[in-house]
Design a protein with these regions (language model features):
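An N-terminal assembly and electron-transfer interface module characteristic of large anaerobic redox
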Residues: 1-431
Length: 431
């Protein structure tokens, strides 16, 4: 019997709605308001995102007074598909301006608005003149001709163009570019901790987390750091970083994604070269290494010699196995096999096999052959939840892995605690 998993999807291009991306790019920019030119149901998506983001933020230690900006639907109905929804949008804009007194309006377009053919840009320009505030519109319509990140990056670029100005630089300051859970998320907190070795202070995170009236000041940063990963997200954030560099003289730290110890070392040394402080970078590497290996030595009494398998079902552009296998070697665990799920096409499977083979000598087997092996090992690390065996101990490998030394320690701690669980009871742990 083959291994059964949840949500086995494999695609190279995102297929999603652009409207949540529009909202997320301004979610905590106090002074702004977002209008969804959409039926009421579409606004429920943003509301659900808002609730989930609030719970994640509180879990990560954010202040409880965290407040997202207003999101209002223009309440398109069936009749507007015949007569158009422009008047409905105008009425919504007037209501939002009178109710919330925003300093900036951002309009997200739904599929319905795109099918109708409403000229949202014209309504935006008209409203900007009427109310005397910036009104930003985006060139994408729900699922029709864009996706989440197209809306996200469109708003980011327009906020930069409308509000940024050249400023006198503040020494030893940095601007974070991207989201990854916001200022209270693991990525941002870890980057701030590592920057402390160089006495660098973060003055903001763009887009989404800087009040509208403070946007002109953030170009005073000495440089910017991209909170990116791989693929289209990183490419889009890099475009924003280049815009800041070309137009506002804010250079950015290039080529760095501190996932895994080796990449964290590269990131620190790259930062040292960028800042012309190579000596500080080497001191940081030594201190971080001592911290990491001290923790590894502490937990190896449990992890040493334990048998595990790694199950992979993501494409190489989204998931690189090197960091995971590096951690398992550090903990002196025995990798019995690498199981590749059946959702790969021939090209993607070949790329993943090459990446795994370069890091590990364990056999690479398919989904059918791996089922029996799962029942004999101490631990399964997997990119997809395995559903047809409740007795195995699983650790779910996230799409966005934890970064830096703290991320490595947290991952090792998760492995340690999972192996320490008593009895034969299985289950899944999310890092």
């Amino acid at each position: 019997m083959a291994i059964k998993t949840k949500r086995m999807l494999s695609k190279t291009k995102s297929c999603s709605c652009s409207m949540p991306g529009v909202w997320r790019a301004a979610a905590y920019c106090s002074g702004a308001a977002v209008i969804f030119h959409s039926p009421r149901a579409c606004a429920h998506v943003a509301r659900s995102m808002d609730i989930s983001a609030q719970y994640r933020a509180l879990a990560n230690g954010a202040a409880e007074n965290l407040k997202p900006i207003p999101v209002v639907s223009s309440m398109l109905q069936e009749k507007h598909s015949i007569f158009g929804g422009a008047d409905c949008l105008r009425a919504c804009i007037e209501d939002v301006v009178n109710t919330y007194r925003p300093k900036c309006l951002i309009i997200a377009n739904s599929c319905v608005a795109g099918v109708i053919g409403d000229d949202v840009e014209a309504v935006g320009k008209e409203s900007e003149v009427k109310y005397g505030i910036p009104v930003l519109t985006v060139p994408c319509y729900g699922f029709l001709d864009g996706e989440y990140y197209q809306g996200y990056f469109a708003v980011a670029e327009q906020l930069a163009e409308r509000f940024f100005h050249k400023q006198t630089k503040l020494e030893n300051t940095a601007l974070l570019i991207g989201d990854n859970g916001g200022p209270w998320g693991h990525y941002a907190k870890e980057v701030k901790r590592l920057l402390a070795y160089f006495s660098i202070k973060v003055i903001g995170q763009f887009p989404g987390y800087i009040p509208i009236n403070e946007l002109p000041q953030i170009t005073a940063a000495s440089f910017s750091i991209i909170l990116g990963g791989r693929g289209q997200t990183y490419n889009g954030l890099t475009k924003i970083a280049r815009l800041l560099e070309m137009n506002y003289e804010v250079p950015y730290l290039q080529d760095g994604y501190p996932v895994g110890w080796d990449n964290t070392v590269d990131w620190l040394r790259n930062l040292g070269v960028f800042l012309h402080q190579e000596d500080l970078a080497e001191k940081a590497v030594v201190q971080e290494k001592d911290k990491l290996f001290a923790f590894a030595d502490k937990v190896k009494k449990i992890t040493q010699g334990k048998r595990c398998v790694v199950c992979i079902g993501r494409m190489l552009m989204y998931f690189h196995p090197a960091g995971i296998l590096e951690t398992l070697r550090r903990l002196e665990m025995q990798v019995e096999a690498i199981i590749l799920f059946d959702n790969y096409n021939t090209k993607e499977r070949k790329l993943m096999v090459e990446a795994v083979s370069a890091q590990c000598q364990a056999p690479i087997i398919d989904q059918t052959a791996g089922q029996q092996l799962l029942e004999t090992v101490d631990l399964v690390l997997t990119t997809h939840e395995i559903t047809n065996n409740q007795d195995i101990k699983q650790i779910f490998l996230p799409m966005l892995p934890l970064v830096g030394t703290s991320g490595e320690i947290e991952f090792m701690d998760c492995i340690y605690k999972t192996l320490c669980r008593r009895g034969e009871k299985g289950g899944i742990v999310y890092v």
